[in-house]
Curated annotation (Swiss-Prot):
Pfam families: PfkB (PF00294). Belongs to the carbohydrate kinase PfkB family. It comes from Escherichia coli (strain K12). This is 1-phosphofructokinase. Its EC number is 2.7.1.56. Optimum pH is 7.8 in 50 mM Tris-HC1 and 8.5 in 50 mM NH(4)HCO(3). Its cofactor is Mg(2+). ATP binds at S223, L224, G225, A226, E227, G228, G254, D255.
Length: 312
């Protein structure tokens, strides 16, 4: 098994991350800058996987006018770059964390993908993604890419690479789910929107997760925020609760969890071990200002503190 992974980020961003004790609307707010990172959900996943020793190739779209930060990151990390450069600028997302851990996002607009850009991407990506063990498709749709076009591409991709990991929201989530990817990771609110009803109890969440599985999705992982995560597949149902940590930033925590899930699945670990690992990687992410794993012993210690139980 070659254990190669590709991640696709159609709408990446520069994340400007800061800390503001309490945001006051209509006032001047002083913000402590904690970082400016070339990011995007699939890129964050790639960083985690690279730190865990997995060969990763990244793809999607980058704006021509401000691509240098991304190109430098890929070079520094030794990540193979298959991004398609288009006219315009990659967007900037401002993410502010308050003292209570609440994160407020300001997502700016960026480049627009033309029909010719999209046609080229579809043709090119489908020519090389089939060689990978797993493909992770993450994030939102850029301007110019319709949900219908995205569903069509995802469906064609699945015929070439059955193991698609999908993590998105809003219209992109709805569109991608129609292609029945192998693993999906919505949060509880996104699952409620898909189900068209509130899911107040854990049994309601599990019921909705099984409804997704009935559409041909093998693995459904529900992010529960500080409460951890729920994994539902053919083998059972498990709930993992992360250890308590000092929160620095929750930015990229969900992407870190996806990276942990992919790693465990690639290594053919059990569902229990994989969910424990993924929960620990996410907990590690919130305790630092940037995504990544620099201390493997620290990760192992975090794994030992994860509370994982089968759901009865």
């Amino acid at each position: 098994m070659s254990r190669r992974v590709a991640t696709i980020t159609l709408n990446p961003a520069y994340d400007l991350v800061g800390f503001c004790p309490e945001i006051e609307r209509g006032e001047v707010n002083l913000v402590k800058t904690t970082g400016l990172h070339a990011a995007g959900k699939g890129i964050n996943v790639a960083k985690v996987l690279k730190d865990l020793g997995i060969d990763v190739t990244v793809g999607g779209f980058l704006g021509k006018d401000n691509q240098d930060g991304f190109q430098q990151l890929f070079s520094e990390l030794g990540i193979a770059n298959r991004f398609q450069v288009v006219q315009g600028r990659t967007r900037i997302n401002v993410k502010l964390t308050e003292k209570d851990g609440e994160v407020t996002d300001f997502n700016f607009s960026g480049f627009e993908v033309t029909p010719a850009d999209w046609e080229r991407f579809v043709t090119d990506s489908l020519s090389w993604l089939g060689q990978f063990d797993m493909v992770c498709v993450s994030g939102s749709l850029p301007s110019g890419v319709s949900p219908e076009a995205f569903t069509d591409w995802m469906t064609r991709l699945r015929s070439q690479c059955p193991c698609i990991i999908f993590d998105s929201s809003r219209e992109a989530l709805v569109a991608g789910l129609k292609a029945a990817p192998w693993l999906v990771k919505p949060n509880r609110r996104e699952l409620e929107i898909w189900a068209g009803r509130k899911l107040p109890e854990m049994k309601d969440v599990i019921e909705a997760a099984h409804a997704l599985r009935e559409q041909g999705i093998a693995h459904v992982v529900i992010s529960l925020g500080a409460e951890g995560a729920l994994w539902v597949n053919a083998s059972g149902e498990w709930i993992a609760k992360p250890p308590s940590v000092d929160v620095v930033s929750t930015v990229g925590a969900g992407d870190s969890m996806v990276g942990g899930l992919i790693y465990g699945l690639l290594m053919r670990e059990s569902s229990e071990h994989t969910l424990r690992l993924a929960t620990a990687v996410a907990a590690l992410a919130v305790s630092q200002s940037n995504v990544g794993i620099t201390d493997r012993p620290q990760l192992a210690a975090m794994m030992a503190r994860v509370d994982l139980q089968p759901f009865n």
